[in-house]
Amino acid sequence: MTTREFDYIICGAGSAGNVLATRLTEDPGVTVLLLEAGGPDYRFDFRTQMPAALAYPLQGRRYNWAYETDPEPHMNHRRMECGRGKGLGGSSLINGMCYIRGNALDYDNWATHKALEDWAYLDCLPYFRKAETRDVGPNDYHGGDGPVSVTTSKPGVNPLFEAMVEAGVQAGYPRTDDLNGYQQEGFGPMDRTVTPRGRRASTARGYLDQARARPNLEIVTHALADRILFSGKRATGVTFLHGSARVTAHARREVLVCSGAIASPQLLQRSGVGPGEWLRELDIPVVLDLPGVGRNLQDHLEMYIQFECKEPVSLYPALKWWNQPKIGLEWMLNGTGLGASNHFEAGGFIRTRDDDPWPNIQYHFLPVAINYNGSNAIEMHGFQAHVGSMRSPSRGRVKLKSRDPHAHPSILFNYMAEALDWREFRDAIRATREIMRQPALDRFRGRELNPGADLKSDNELDTFVRARAETAFHPSCSCKMGYDDMAVVDNEGRVHGIDGLRVVDASIMPIITTGNLNAPTIMIAEKIADRIRQHKPLERSNAQYYVANGAPARGGKPARAPAVV
């Protein structure tokens, strides 16, 4: 491959990069080079295409960067997982397929920051709708002709889902019919990025399938970006490794970094854009001393609150190898059955205290007791709630350790560094126990398996969190958007102080959103794609949305009072 020129070079074919590649090449006169360090999204590989197989990609390195954190000082010095997608689709190729946009007040809060006024919820909602085709049809909140297929859970899938939602309502929390609609707060069915044929709806399937055949788009897989090239303070191209070759490509207009919250700051730092003292430690020539690159790192931490199930209605039999061929065959031939669901079909968001302005705790309900990555399966019928806080005040960082593009960076989330973190996790455990002991779950609920009913004091719960809490795989905010001293990009993703360079992915979120990050990342890319193309922004929505305004976190007393601790 010889040196080539393109209008735009995109580094990373993930949740954001595929959106940009597809939208930019809608203009036939625009040429785009899309670089992806991983391989194709093989459609015959059940590990990435079958929703129920979501744990498999995290267990290897074909589709997973398999990063690990530095020892986390507040988590028993554990090195914790930080899985990130590798291959066309990026993390949308290996994520849990939960389609959660965040709370409207997340975006309204962004919009209170200097010059981010056009990131308010009603400005973002049209781009959420543009990206989506929802199986039950469009409305003021949902799209009907977008690239990403979204399936919402239907009644009757598993009695545990309906019982867990009803238990939340019996505990005094709201019921909501749509976690992405008028009111996120409450318990209800989950939307999922799954096609009508029961396949994972990654951005490779949804977006790139529209664009692959365009003559103005060149996709190169197994292409690891090494450095961004500069002429003074202008980005002019990228060098990347492709097989044994080092290749240079030039960008006539812009370089677009879409490598995610770990690899985007890593690439910027390796190219000489980042905290000057970090770069000098590795003898990297400083193009721009930009102190926020790699800082402000955020994530969601979660726990598994697990119970024995007294009736044989859980997914426990599906974990047995002798039942899996039948499940796989039905999925492969018909796109139906247990294989066609990620099994996160119900969940919710609550405020644990009345003075929380919007939900601070998320629930994913699952009708089996097992870790997200497929490990530590409980050998009995069981069910669980994945529970975690949404907007931790703790902040971490991504720091380059080597100029070698194959080397992983130093990652420290600094989980649970603040007193509020501990209060919210204790509140979450106690609220979950109260939900689980409501009458709706009486016929199913057996023993509490984790943390264990004997753990009651603050110290005992804190010990459990330190030892057992895990990442929800939502790294973000490490190249934050804004105009303060630690901001990396402006309101259109343009890197401060550099021409011809943008970052467009979850790393530019100023503050993490309330929920899973795939849907917000796609929205961010859709919105910035219009700015790159100099299109007029989509018309602002006038949809109504719920604001608590000091209302009690619970609308009524629980049907069954909490156990005395």
From Swiss-Prot:
Detail which positions bind FAD.
7-36
The UniProt entry, under InterPro entries, shows: BetA (IPR011533), FAD/NAD-bd_sf (IPR036188), GMC_OxRdtase (IPR012132), GMC_OxRdtase_N (IPR000172), GMC_OxRtase_C (IPR007867)
An example GO CC term for this entry is: membrane
Q: Which SUPFAM superfamilies match?
A: FAD-linked reductases, C-terminal domain (SSF54373), FAD/NAD(P)-binding domain (SSF51905)
Any one biological process term the GO annotation gives: glycine betaine biosynthetic process from choline
Named in its record, the pathway it takes part in is: Amine and polyamine biosynthesis; betaine biosynthesis via choline pathway; betaine aldehyde from choline (cytochrome c reductase route): step 1/1
Kindly list the GO molecular function terms attached to this UniProt entry: betaine-aldehyde dehydrogenase (NAD+) activity; choline dehydrogenase activity; flavin adenine dinucleotide binding
Signal peptide positions on this chain: none
One Pfam family hit: GMC_oxred_C
Q: Does the keyword Nucleotide-binding apply?
A: no
Domain of life assignment: Bacteria
Q: Quote the catalytic activity from the record.
A: choline + A = betaine aldehyde + AH2; betaine aldehyde + NAD(+) + H2O = glycine betaine + NADH + 2 H(+)
Claim: Nuclease is one of the keywords in the record:
no
- Cofactor entry: FAD
Keyword vocabulary terms for this entry: FAD, Flavoprotein, NAD, Oxidoreductase
Q: Where is the active site?
A: H474 (proton acceptor)
What EC number(s) does this enzyme carry?
Answer: 1.1.99.1, 1.2.1.8
The protein's matches in PANTHER family, at most eight in alphabetical order, are given as: CHOLINE DEHYDROGENASE, MITOCHONDRIAL, GLUCOSE-METHANOL-CHOLINE GMC OXIDOREDUCTASE
Please state which protein family the record places this protein in: Belongs to the GMC oxidoreductase family.
Q: What is the role of this chain?
A: Involved in the biosynthesis of the osmoprotectant glycine betaine. Catalyzes the oxidation of choline to betaine aldehyde and betaine aldehyde to glycine betaine at the same rate.
Q: Which NCBIfam families match?
A: betA, PRK02106.1
HAMAP family found in the cross-reference section? Choline_dehydrogen (MF_00750)
Q: Which protein is depicted?
A: Oxygen-dependent choline dehydrogenase
